[in-house]
Amino acid sequence: LAWGDTHFANGLAEALRRLGQEVVIDAFAARNRATSAIDDVSLVLRGPRRIDPPAHGRSLLWIISHPDEITSDELSKYDRIFAASIPWAARAGARLGHSITPLLQCTDAVLFRPQGIPRGKDIVFVGTARGIARPSVVAPIEAGVDVTVYGPDWRRFIPGRFIRASGISHSDLPARYESAAVVLNDHWPAMQKEGFISNRAYDVVAAGGRVISDTVEGLQEHFGGAVRTYDSTSELIGMLRGDLDDLFPSYEKLDAVSRRVRMEDSFDARAQVLLDAAIGTLAR
């Protein structure tokens, strides 16, 4: 599990435990754990690397990123398959010959919720540089827009004065998101192309924050105005130079969207879907 995937797994595990399930999390290195035979159901969170399920018990696959790497052979190993994209689930299901159920990403509604912190003026980005000059961060800075960056590997791409820290505690993210004027977000090219909405958008909106992101199919509609999208860096820069309050709905509408996300797009909601699927496979 990578950094973000670890928090995702922990949040989902806690939600399943609240539903009365006994849950163990295996990192990638433990994917062939010798005691896996005692598990009734294995759930694989498919990120950058393929993981074949244990030979024993039932297995569920939830594809949350890197859809361009999925093969029919990989899917054939699982009893049920979910994917965090509505359009990709339909297209890939037809192309690869497997039934794929849409199950969008989500947020930890226990952690990510408004705390009543006043909105400040910081334009915030949280994440690694990925070894590239990510346009969503570099282009605004080069255009004279101040961006407060949290994350590693940025020093060769932007001046150090824009880097607030090389990381931020997961527990500190809700307050940082809520207090930001706006949080910038972007996607891996394959995720953007295939309609995989990153879970950062869910986290920020659940915490009461506002997001500007690159365009992904269904993103702006799903978040009811709490997320605004751009199609080019010039459009992004124009948005950031303008009055950000004019881009987003009123506080009351944003609060309603935040409550809906915490209710409908929580780990608890997703855990219930996965538990129902697991019970269904065990009943076969």
Tell what function each PLM region has.
Residues 9, 52-145, 154-155, 265-269, ...:
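Catalytic core of nucleotide-activated saccharide and alditol-phosphate transferases
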Residues 147-158, 163:
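Catalytic core and acceptor-binding pocket of nucleotide-sugar-dependent glycosyltransferases
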Residues 1-56, 80, 88-95, 101-102, ...:
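N-terminal pre-catalytic "stem/leader" segment of glycosyltransferase-like enzymes
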Residues 23, 59, 100, 147, ...:
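Hydrophobic beta-strand scaffold residues
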Residues 47-49, 65, 189:
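Short glycine-rich anion-binding loops that position phosphate/pyrophosphate groups of nucleotides
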Residues 7-11, 16, 24-27, 159-282:
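Catalytic binding pocket for nucleotide-activated donors in carbohydrate/polymer assembly enzymes
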Residues 35, 74-75, 175-176:
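Structural alpha-helical scaffold elements that stabilize or flank donor/cofactor-binding regions
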